[in-house]
Amino acid sequence: MLKIGVMLSIILVLFPLATLQLVAERPAAERYAENKQDLNPDERRNYLVDLGVERTCCTACNIPPCKCCA
């Protein structure tokens, strides 16, 4: 009976606690991007630049009012 109680406590308490990913363990860039996912595309592009994600530009967008290469 004691073995069953130990197994139940491990399964019901310790296992779920071990599988939880704490917020402090997640990379800061991931948390930052997750918080900004509902922004419009222009704001999202600016946050990607802030996170260090490099974007390449097509040659057809070299016109000054182009927003994808700004």
UniProtKB/Swiss-Prot annotation:
InterPro entries: Conotoxin
Tissue: Expressed by the venom duct.
Keyword Secreted found: yes
Propeptide: 21-55
One function term, GO molecular function aspect: ion channel inhibitor activity
Main location as per UniProt: secreted
Localization per Swiss-Prot or TrEMBL: Secreted
GO cellular component, one term: extracellular region
Signal peptide: 1-20
One Pfam family this sequence matches: Conotoxin
Keywords of this entry: Secreted, Signal, Toxin
Membrane spanning residue stretches: none
Family: Belongs to the conotoxin M superfamily.
Comment block on domains: The cysteine framework is III (CC-C-C-CC). Classified in the M-1 branch, since 1 residue stands between the fourth and the fifth cysteine residues.
Name recorded for this polypeptide: Conotoxin ba3a
Organism (species): Conus bayani (Bayan's cone)
